[in-house]
Amino acid sequence: MKYRSMENRFCMSLVAFAVIARLLLATGVSAALDSAVGLAPKPETPDEPDVFLLEILEPERMPDEPPAQPQAPDEPDESPEPEAEPVEAPLMFSADEADAISIAGACSYRPDKQALLTRPSALSIPEDGPAVLIVHTHSSEAYTMEAGFEYPESDALRTLDERYSVIRVGDEIADILTEAGISVLHDTQPNDYPNYNGAYERMRQTIEEYLAEYPSIRMVLDVHRDAAEDADGNPVALTAEVNGEACAELMLVVGTDEGGLTHPDWQENLANALKVQALLNRAAPGLCRNLDLRTERFNQHETPGSLLVEVGASGNTLAEALRAARIFGQALAVFLRGQMSTKGS
């Protein structure tokens, strides 16, 4: 089985994250993610995490506070009091944020967005072992070519070259999550070539193999590229401007049981998707399309943390998709960090 494992590199304490989470809630995520939309080369020291998530704020001593005095050597040692367990600041969402998210799609269900968005997530991210599995049901999906981004096509707007397909987009998301201290597995094996039909069934088997080998996995993220055409059949780009840069639009897709297949946790998946989209709306208003609620399952019944994201469309460039992927990865990292370890694994 071919896959890419992103080793977990925790770079901050829970106490630090609590402080930063409160700052993010107070000031909004938008300023914190400004750096996520550029296409500058990755730093030579990838172990250095993104500042907005992992910067450690050390407490300062008041100017007139005397320095701590050393203990006299003849005083008996006293057992220190046990330190209190750090408490992470919970992510909070408002009714207005629920109203700002439009749900579309073929599904006839009308879920209560406010109730789902504002209730605590049941997702619990473990500290040990891979927590997120990134997959690509349609692994050969690619983007409109531009100078410097040419690739050999396996079919129209498809390629087996991982550097130019949605697998490259998955790499970007995996890097962001790993830098945030979230352990990731990235499945990069071809899944829709040479036969496009049956891709979801093949991916279901792959997901179940991963879940059996890595029971710590809590979220399965299926990364796609959407297809959009004009009346003449030409690819259409779906773009949003974020901090002066063109980004591919994002669409979160959530499956249900309306098609008749068993899917008991679809509302939990939807609740998590709403939270991620609310964080994206804070960071980059206008980047997300309507949340797509569907009658199909899309293999999301495998875990209550499943999510499908469409990063751009066939008319977008890879550069636009990578900018969007970085913003998505940052928002997803904030959400997942909020579900870490205080609930157990």
Can you describe what each PLM-predicted range is?
Residues 152-156, 228-264:
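A short, glycine/acidic-enriched catalytic loop
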Residues 170-174, 204-208, 270-273, 277, ...:
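Extracytoplasmic/secreted envelope proteins and their assembly/folding machinery
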Residues 286-345:
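Active-site-adjacent mobile loop/cap segments within catalytic or ligand-binding domains
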Residues 10-218, 227-233, 326, 336-344:
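N-terminal catalytic or cofactor-binding beta/alpha core of small enzyme domains
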Residues 205-207, 232-240, 291-297:
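Alpha-helical scaffolding within the catalytic cores
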Residues 265-292:
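Active-site-adjacent substrate-binding region
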Residues 139-142, 190-194, 225-230, 257-260, ...:
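Solvent-exposed loop/turn segments at secondary-structure junctions
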Residues 133-136, 184-186, 219-222, 251-254, ...:
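Structural recognition of the beta-strand scaffold that forms the well-ordered cores
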